[in-house]
Amino acid sequence: MRVLITGCGSRGDTEPLVALAARLRELGADARMCLPPDYVERCAEVGVPMVPVGRAVRAGAREPGELPPGAAEVVTEVVAEWFDKVPAAIEGCDAVVTTGLLPAAVAVRSMAEKLGIPYRYTVLSPDHLPSEQSQAERDMYNQGADRLFGDAVNSHRASIGLPPVEHLYDYGYTDQPWLAADPVLSPLRPTDLGTVQTGAWILPDERPLSAELEAFLAAGSTPVYVGFGSSSRPATADAAKMAIKAVRASGRRIVLSRGWADLVLPDDGADCFVVGEVNLQELFGRVAAAIHHDSAGTTLLAMRAGIPQIVVRRVVDNVVEQAYHADRVAELGVGVAVDGPVPTIDSLSAALDTALAPEIRARATTVADTIRADGTTVAAQLLFDAVSLEKPTVPA
């Protein structure tokens, strides 16, 4: 079986796809990827072939003034880029899995439709499921997508002999999307009919921590992790400054993740250490708590490690209410949610005191034992099954 895995999004959107590709290859399938150029090195690290498509997602990797692939002003270019690059990558494939940016997903599904092979759209958080939206919201998304890039999509579809399509939001997501999220952290609701929950897609990380980080960890009390991942809006640096001040006020040391915002330490104090690319699976087992943005991946890794969390709402995007995982952490009793995008020192200090209380730490340890790690295996088996059922008939 040969599978094409595609996506256009942040590191948090992409890492699960890499995990699935690696697992498929372990099971004997041939997996290849189409991703933005940001992820060439990551795919090379795990030995998965990748075709780079379009412009970089990370602001620091783009030219000054160059718009991101999600900008409305460049959406027709994004559609053209994906229709241009996907055909060569999808040739000979038996199935396609995608996530992320809708214009790219619609192009990918069109190619799968042309070949008559299974297409699966994946979301990483239940609040992104179509079933979680009202009909009015879905109508709005469909109308907006059709207006912004419907003509471009249908022009490219016509060029490969496909009929026009409308309601592009529904078309890209399908009526049976996959949810690649752990059922404890992200349970389905009764209204999520048709959704297939596979469990989270996690790639075991065996990379050692750097000697410098090991020395810092060994040199004093257990630190608190502060990081905001792929968030790079101006408020991210301010949120990090507030978090550092709050942790210092508690008398604890800090490991700061540089992230896509290129965060820097406020001074050269010996109580802080900054990291770039790092094995969070290993690091989270060595810290007292994690202060982070509302991220599916970071939240899950902290839960698996059994450490308390302080999750800041709306750091990533203050327009879209990105607060699902912050609220789930609070509901599960494994941490505290605080309002962003720039929380106050007082709110963070109070949250840190609460999160480090014995009952929260005990609850975090208990919940860690319930987190599954077999999501990629479940998804791979679903693909094997789909290919055997939906494989197109070859004319005699």
Curated annotation (Swiss-Prot):
Reactions listed under catalytic activity: dTDP-beta-L-4-epi-vancosamine + devancoaminyl-vancomycin = chloroorienticin B + dTDP + H(+)
Family indicated by similarity: Belongs to the glycosyltransferase 28 family.
Gene3D superfamilies given in the database record: Glycogen Phosphorylase B (3.40.50.2000)
One of the protein's GO biological processes: vancomycin biosynthetic process
Name of the featured protein: dTDP-epi-vancosaminyltransferase
Enzyme Commission code: 2.4.1.311
One Pfam family from the record: Glyco_transf_28
Keywords: Antibiotic biosynthesis, Glycosyltransferase, Transferase
Binding-site list for dTDP-beta-L-4-epi-vancosamine: 10-12, 207, 230, 277-278, 293-298
Binding site for devancoaminyl-vancomycin: 127, 133, 141, 169
Miscellaneous information on this protein: In A.orientalis different glycosyltransferases are involved in biosynthesis of the vancomycin group of antibiotics. GtfA, GtfB (AC P96559) and GtfC (AC P96560) are involved in biosynthesis of antibiotic chloroeremomycin, while GtfD (AC Q9AFC7) and GtfE (AC G4V4R9) are involved in biosynthesis of vancomycin.
Function: Catalyzes the attachment of 4-epi-vancosamine from a TDP donor to the beta-OH-Tyr-6 of the aglycone cosubstrate in the biosynthesis of glycopeptide antibiotic chloroeremomycin, a member of the vancomycin group of antibiotics. Strongly prefers devancoaminyl-vancomycin (DVV) as substrate rather than the heptapeptide vancomycin aglycone (AGV). Acts downstream of GtfB.
A single GO molecular function term of this UniProt record: UDP-glycosyltransferase activity
InterPro entries assigned: EryCIII-like_C, Glycosyltransferase_28, GlycoTrans_28_N, UDP_glucos_trans
The keyword Transferase appears for this protein: yes
Pathway(s) it belongs to: Antibiotic biosynthesis; vancomycin biosynthesis
Gene responsible for this protein: gtfA
